Amino acid sequence: VTSNRRSNTELSYTFHGRDVYAYTGAKLASGHISFEEVGPELPVDKILELPVVETIIEDNLVRGAIDILDVRFGSLWTSITRDDFYALEPNFGDRFEVTIFNNDMLVYQNQVTYGKSFADVRIGQPIIYINSLYRVGLAINQGSFAKAYNVGVGSNWHIEIKRLGD
């Protein structure tokens, strides 16, 4: 759909939300193009649904998926909402056991502090925080969590956050 893409972005393949989807949506909403001009109709049986990992909350544990890697900083963004995490009744400064699996393989397990900002832990230390999407994030202060522990994203990457005894 080359004609429905922001001009001078033909060689850019990383910002389709901006260059293709938003641009085409704006043209469609403003009446500059019709549905037929967006592109060919896709058969319903060709639509692929991706699995969604459900968040599970148990007594002192919350489980979810690692959905997004913030590539600029190496932070992990999870499917666990702020409200789901709050079921563990966290206070800033509390420590939690964080366990990460790739399918069934253990990739990471350690105690991590819950903080307001990265400054709540020493440089090089991991931190649990609430990101701008109100989801649980996991990072290293001034480092890349993803690179340090070779963590990826997707429905096969699972995270467990367990409240430690007081």
Can you say where each PLM-predicted feature lies in the sequence?
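A conserved acidic, glycine/proline-rich C-terminal tail/linker
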Residues: L76-N150
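A short, terminal or domain-edge coil/loop segment
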Residues: V1-S7, I56, F96-V98
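Ser/Thr- (and often Asn-) enriched beta-sheet segments in non-cytosolic proteins
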Residues: A65, E97-T99, H158-E160
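Active-site catalytic microenvironments in core metabolic enzymes, especially phosphate/sugar-handling
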Residues: S3-E10, G17-R18, R122, N131-K147, ...
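Short acidic/glycine-rich loops and adjacent helix/strand connectors
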Residues: A26, D94, I100, L164-G165
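Anionic-ligand-binding alpha/beta catalytic cores of soluble enzymes and soluble regulatory domains
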Residues: S7-F92
